[in-house]
């Protein structure tokens, strides 16, 4: 009986060591959030890659789905018009969030995906009306100077800066084919933050 118990505990320990090794190897934290309001549903799938040795702390990929049954039906029957067209453009949104820690508030004037240096980039605010999003070509990095009046300040604590980059469905399909994600962020101070990691996107049903 003791031998059975011993080997049972040993098997569990081996499994846990393997599990945590795989988690560390992949370095990806997955989270799924489902929110319902009336008959509508919002589903966020969130993939977080953690970095340890630089001011760039996290790369977060988010796939957001908005499901509105009434408009979902219209989309299926190929309806047109402002609401139907806006829903088609916004029902699934792909986004990267880059989290950079510093003692200053940062702006980011450029984002470069290696292999797609000629990508078409927009720089409008994320809260503009949906017709702007219908015109999204490759990706949007937001207004790099929105917090310009604070750029000169230095703080005695860590400032957690987040750069949100919304990407089009077409551009998402392109980067999903890459073996590695090589991305460079350039701040308002011309500091470069480089990412070179295995492309985890093809591993998931996105």
Curated annotation (Swiss-Prot):
Keywords linked to the UniProt accession: Cell outer membrane, Membrane, Plasmid, Signal, Virulence
Where does this protein chiefly localize? membrane
The subcellular localization recorded is: Cell outer membrane
Which InterPro entries does the protein's record reference?
A: BptA (IPR031471)
User: Does this UniProt record's set of keywords contain Membrane?
Assistant: yes
Q: Name one GO cellular component term.
A: cell outer membrane
One short Pfam name that applies is BPTA
So which residues are the signal peptide here?
A: 1-19
Q: What is this protein called?
A: Protein BptA
Q: Which organism is it from?
A: Borreliella burgdorferi (strain N40)
Biological classification of the source = Bacteria, Pseudomonadati, Spirochaetota, Spirochaetia, Spirochaetales
């Amino acid at each position: 009986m003791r031998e059975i118990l011993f080997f049972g505990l040993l098997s569990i320990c081996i499994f846990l060591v393997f599990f945590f090794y795989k988690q560390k190897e992949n370095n990806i934290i997955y989270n799924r959030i489902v929110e319902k309001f009336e008959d509508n549903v919002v589903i966020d799938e969130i993939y977080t890659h953690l970095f340890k040795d630089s001011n760039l702390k996290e790369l977060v990929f988010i796939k957001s789905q908005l499901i509105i049954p009434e408009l979902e039906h219209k989309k299926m029957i190929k309806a047109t018009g402002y609401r139907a067209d806006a829903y088609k453009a916004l029902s699934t949104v792909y986004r990267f969030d880059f989290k950079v820690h510093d003692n200053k508030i940062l702006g980011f004037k450029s984002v470069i995906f290696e292999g797609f240096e000629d990508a078409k980039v927009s720089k409008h605010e994320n809260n503009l009306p949906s017709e702007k999003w219908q015109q999204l070509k490759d990706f949007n990095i937001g207004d790099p100077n929105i917090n310009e009046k604070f750029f000169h300040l230095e703080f005695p604590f860590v400032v957690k800066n987040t750069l949100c980059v919304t990407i089009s469905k077409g551009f998402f399909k392109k980067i999903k084919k890459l073996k590695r994600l090589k991305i460079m962020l350039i701040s308002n101070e011309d500091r470069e933050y480089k990412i070179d990691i295995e492309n985890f996107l093809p591993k998931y049903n996105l």
